A protein has these predicted regions:
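Short, conserved active-site loop motifs that form the nucleotide-linked donor/cofactor pocket
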Residues: 97-98, 112, 143
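A short SAM/SAH-binding and catalytic strip from SAM-dependent methyltransferases
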Residues: 110-129
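Class I SAM-dependent methyltransferase SAM/SAH-binding core
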Residues: 53, 57-107
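A conserved mid-domain beta-alpha-beta active-site/ligand-binding segment of alpha/beta enzyme cores
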Residues: 158-231
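Conserved beta-strand signature within the Rossmann-like core of class I S-adenosyl-L-methionine
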Residues: 139-154
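C-terminal non-catalytic accessory extensions
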Residues: 221-270
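A short glycine-rich, Lys/Arg-flanked "PGG" loop and its adjoining helix->strand segment in the class I
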Residues: 121, 129-141
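Class I SAM-dependent methyltransferase Rossmann-like catalytic core
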Residues: 1-50, 54, 59-61
C-alpha cells in the first residue's frame, strides 16, 4: 500500500510543542544504525512507496536532512518528510526533503519508517503507550518506528525499534572515547525505560551486567575501547544475554537486544 502523497493540512496535529533542541550530527549514531540494520533495510527496499517521516525534528531541520542523505545510501528514491507540531518551525523544502506541520497522527501520511528522536522523552511515561499506538496505527503495512533519546552532542544514545505488534529491540550506542561505562547511558534511556532502571527490573540487570563485563574486559584496554567492548559484549552473551551479533566493524560501542529481555515488569497493584 503506497503512502499518502502529501501531508494533510486539515488533520489536527496530535501532541505537545517541545523544546526543539537539536544540533548538527546529533543523531548520527541512530542514522548509522538505521542505514545498516537488516530489518530496516528490508522494509525500505521492499516498500512500494519508500516514505520516511522524521517526527519532531525541532528548531532546525539539519538532522532530517542528514538522515535523508544517510538513508538514501540504502534506497536512492527515498521520500523524506519532516514533521513539526510547532508551525513556526516548519521550513521550506530542500535537498529533496519536504517539511510540514504534524504530530503523532503523522499528518495523514502512511510512512514505512518513522524516526521520533528526543520527542517522547519530554512526555510523561504514562503518555508513551498512546503515543506509540497512534504513530504505529498510521504506518504503512510493515512499517517501523524508531523511538530514541540522546544527549546534546549525540555521544550517548538509546532507541527502541517498534512495529505494529509493539517494541522489537532496544539499542544502546555510545562514543567509545567519552563514556566511562555502559551504565552512563541510563540517563538517556527512552521514556518507556528511564524510570525502570531500578533493582529487579530487566534494564537495571542488563546495565549492571554490562558494567561488570566492561570491568572484566579491562585487560584489553590497551587495544582501545572498541576492542574492550567487543570482548565485554561476548562476555554478556556467554552469560545468556541475547545480544544481536555484530556483523561489521563499528565506530560506536553498541548493543542491540530483543525487547523481551529488557521489557518493564508489570506494575504490582497495591
Amino acid at each position: 500500500m503506497a503512502g499518502s502523497a502529501a501531508p494533510r493540512r486539515l488533520i489536527k496535529p496530535i501532541g505537545t510543542i517541545t523544546r526543539g533542541t537539536t544540533g548538527i550530527n546529533r543523531l548520527r549514531r541512530g542514522d548509522r544504525w538505521l542505514a545498516h540494520d537488516a530489518t530496516v533495510a528490508e522494509r525500505l527496499l521492499n516498500a512500494d512507496d519508500p516514505l520516511v517521516v522524521d517526527l519532531g525534528y525541532g528548531a532546525s531541520p539539519v538532522t532530517t536532512l542528514e538522515m535523508a542523505a544517510r538513508l538514501r545510501t540504502v534506497r536512492a528514491d527515498l521520500r523524506v518528510v519532516g514533521l513539526e507540531i510547532d508551525p513556526e518551525r516548519v521550513v521550506p523544502g530542500q535537498d529533496g526533503v519536504t517539511f510540514a506541520r504534524g504530530g503523532f497522527e503523522l499528518a495523514g501520511l502512511r510512512p514505512i519508517l518513522v524516526r521520533a528522536f528526543n520527542v517522547l522523552r519530554q512526555y510523561p511515561e504514562s503518555a508513551v503507550p498512546e503515543a506509540w499506538s497512534t504513530i504505529l496505527s498510521g504506518l504503512a503495512p510493515g512499517g517501523l518506528l524508531l523511538d530514541g533519546t540522546c544527549d546534546e552532542l549525540g555521544r550517548r544514545c538509546a532507541w527502541i525499534l517498534l512495529d505494529r505488534t509493539g517494541p522489537r529491540t532496544l539499542t544502546l550506542a555510545w562514543d567509545p572515547f567519552t563514556v566511562e561505562e555502559p551504565s552512563d547511558l541510563a540517563e538517556r534511556l527512552p521514556k518507556a525505560l528511564i524510570h525502570r532502571n531500578i533493582p529487579g527490573e530487566p534494564i537495571h540487570t542488563l546495565l549492571t551486567a554490562a558494567d561488570r563485563a566492561w570491568s572484566h574486559a579491562a585487560p584489553l584496554a590497551p587495544y582501545g575501547p572498541r576492542a574492550r567492548w567487543r570482548h565485554a559484549a561476548d562476555l554478556l552473551r556467554q552469560q545468556g544475554f541475547p545480544l544481536h551479533p555484530q556483523r561489521r566493524r563499528l565506530r560506536d560501542n553498541q548493543l542491540t537486544i530483543p525487547w523481551s529481555a529488557v521489557a518493564p515488569l508489570p506494575h504490582q497493584g497495591g
